[in-house]
Every structure is written in structure tokens, then in C-alpha cells.
Amino acid sequence: MKKGGVRSYRRSSTSKRSVIDDDSEPELPSMTKEAIASHKADSGSSDNEVESDHESKSSSKKLKENAKEEEGGEEEEEDEYVVEKVLKHRMARKGGGYEYLLKWEGYDDPSDNTWSSEADCSGCKQLIEAYWNEHGGRPEPSKRKRTARPKKPEAKEPSPKSRKTDEDKHDKDSNEKIEDVNEKTIKFADKSQEEFNENGPPSGQPNGHIESDNESKSPSQKESNESEDIQIAETPSNVTPKKKPSPEVPKLPDNRELTVKQVENYDSWEDLVSSIDTIERKDDGTLEIYLTWKNGAISHHPSTITNKKCPQKMLQFYESHLTFRENE
């Protein structure tokens, strides 16, 4: 053989043939180790970012829910008030029953005390029962009906015309009494003269002439005596002015309410009223005064009446509820 005609083949280790079966999957192109490692690192970091975003969103949501729960709890705590004691009671203006003056726990200022109806006091029934036990028990319904407070119009001052009529009537009565006294005096003098004429002069007067005191006195003394007689006739001694009865504390059992008719005849309530309890403003703007009498009874009247009947008690109530602001 000729050397020039021989071909030489170099077999490489990387050029192996791989036999591919019909059922086997095709072989994917191979990747370097560095590419695989970088791909895994990228996929792991993206997964961590997704998980961290999800955790941050869930934690922020929980914080918001906790904040809402705390705010709701604070609002509930702020709206809680506790009744410490029942101080007084009064008849309800509408719907019957009673209203109670409540003192709240932690509020010692009397102006913070409030009136509440019996229906609104369902949470302090034990305190209400204790209050009635201290005051001799709850009154029967029949008694409460008898003590209903009728409305009374405000007392009106007499007009100048009516006052003048009363004065004229009083002067007329006085003149009639003076005339009656003078008439009796004249009749008595006539009777004495008749007896003198029938029986004759008394002993010691032989001429039958009785010298009167006026005849023996000087003219100036006679004039003074005449003026005195006129003054005595104008003011007869048998006419005595009528005295008004002194006011007395109304004698009523406890837990009864005084009506305006029972106390309107008293000129002054200063010695009858124990205390002014509270003042209430009506829908028409007028003030209603609730007060307690010294016998334990309670009542309420317009301020136009109490200002005249017990002005000192009203002044004490206003002074006790004054608040002063310090100068900064």
C-alpha cells in the first residue's frame, strides 16, 4: 500500500455517540455549574421577597385590627359611669312614677348630679331599694295619686285701681265706726240730762247748777280740751287692727308633696323651706324651682314665686353653685 493513500483518524473522548431510543426523551443542552448556581440563587431570592411581602402585609393588617380593637375598648371604657348613691326623689312630670337624683362615682361636685327616670335606673335597682328603706319604704300608688300637683297661675299683684278701692272701703268702715261711737256718746248725754231733770241737783249744789270742768277752766284750756276730744273721736279705742296669724310649718307626713294652694297664704317661706334642691328650665324658657320643706315634704314652684317668698334661700343656692376662674 502506498503511504500517501492512508487516512488517519483521531478519536476524541468527547465525540462519543449516544444511542437514542425511540421512547426516550431528547437530551437537553447541558448547562455549566455557574449558570445553574446563579439560577437557583435568583429563584430563591424572588421566593423570599414574595414571602416577606406577604408577611409584611399580614402583620400590618393585624396591627390595624389590634388598633381598632383598642380604640373600641377605650370608647367603651370612657362611656362607663357608675352610680354611687341615690340622693333624692320627685314625681315624674310625664308617665307617672318617680325620678331620682343620682350621684356618680368619682364626681363629688353637686352640679354633676343628674335626675334620671325610674325606667333609666334599671342598673341601680339595689341602690333605689336601699334609698326607700332609709326613707320608710316606697309610698303606695293611691297616695301618689292624691298628691298630684295641680297647676296654679302665677300670683298677680293687685292693680292700682283695686288698691284704691280697698283703701276707700277701709276709710268708709272707719268713718262708720266713729259715727257709731259719737251717736252712742250723744245718747248717753241725753239720758244723763233726763235723769238730772227727774232727780234734781245732787247734794252740795243748792242752786241746782253743776259747774262743769270746762266752765271752771280758762278759754285756752277749753280749746285744748276740745282738740283732744276731736282726736279721741277720730281714733276710737274700741277699734283694734286685726293681726295676721303667724306662719307655721305645714304638718304633713313624710314623702308627701305640698301644693301651691297649701302654702300660698304664707307671706314668707324663709323659715319653712329647708333647702333649694335644683332648678329646671322648661321648654318655654321659664325656671321651675324644686325645694324641700322642713317637715320633709317636697314641691316645685315657678321662680317668680320663690324669688318673692324665699329670696335668701334662692341667693344661698346660687352662691353655692358659683364657679370662679383664676386670673392667669
UniProtKB/Swiss-Prot annotation:
Record localization: Nucleus; Chromosome
Basic residues: bias regions: 1-14
Domain of life: Eukaryota
GO cellular component, one term: heterochromatin
Modification type Phosphoserine: residues: S24, S220, S227, S246
InterPro entries referenced in this protein's UniProt entry, alphabetically: Chromo-like_dom_sf (IPR016197), Chromo/chromo_shadow_dom (IPR000953), Chromo_domain (IPR023780), Chromo_shadow_dom (IPR008251), Chromodomain_CS (IPR023779), Heterochromatin_chromo-domain (IPR051219)
MF annotations from Gene Ontology: chromatin binding; chromatin-protein adaptor activity; DNA binding; histone reader activity; identical protein binding; methylated histone binding; RNA binding
Pfam family, one: Chromo_shadow
Positions with biased composition (Basic and acidic residues): 51-70, 151-194
Region span, Disordered: 1-81, 132-259
Cited function: Recognizes and binds histone H3 tails methylated at 'Lys-9', leading to epigenetic repression. Involved in the repression of the silent mating-type loci MAT2 and MAT3. May compact MAT2/3 into a heterochromatin-like conformation which represses the transcription of these silent cassettes.
Subunit structure: Interacts with histone H3 methylated at 'Lys-9'. Interacts with the cohesin subunit psc3. Interacts with hrk1. Interacts with the CAF-1 complex at the G1/S-phase transition and early S-phase, but not in the G2 phase.
Name this protein carries in UniProt: Chromatin-associated protein swi6
Gene, per the UniProt record: swi6
